[in-house]
Amino acid sequence: MGRRFHSFRWRKLILPGILTASLFSVSATSHNAQETGFDLAGKPVDPLKAANGKAVVLIFVRTDCPVSNRYAPLIQKLSDEYARRADFWLVYPDKKEDAEVIRQHDREYGYKIPALRDPQHALVKLSQAQITPEAAVFDASGRLAYHGRIDDLYVDMARSRRAATTHELDDAIKAALSGKNLTLATKPAVGCYISDLE
């Protein structure tokens, strides 16, 4: 996919992605059942079981979402920064995006993060994700500690700040790595809605 988007595609795929929920905390949820996506070779992968005791960060993206594409440099930067202590995965929840399209997208935007397809939305449900881009952070025990926006760069789909003033994903990773008993936190994301399975 290129960086240009046809207007009809924009109207179809990009909706005002601010969720109505506000910031809240509840008990962190644990990962019990096997939840898998598929790597680009079609092999099932459970990113939490593959972590070997590290924190896990899932970033939900899609190839044709301009908001998530704008975040690509920051997502890669955070992955590089935390590489020794956290596993990052790009998760593509749109079942229409095949492996070759995803490979092309990752090359175009400079991603070096492993990618997973999530056509059955197993990881979407596990992470409670609704938007791309949206991040989910799991601590080393597999508990979901955070899901929501990466930062507050976008006010809504039509407005963005010159620079972010809060950095929720970075803060959530630091908290997950602290080893403290965490509660689940969330912050509304702005972007493209994840479509329901047809």
Regions found by a protein language model. Name each.
Residues 139-140, 144-198:
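Thiol-/selenol-based redox modules, centered on thioredoxin-like
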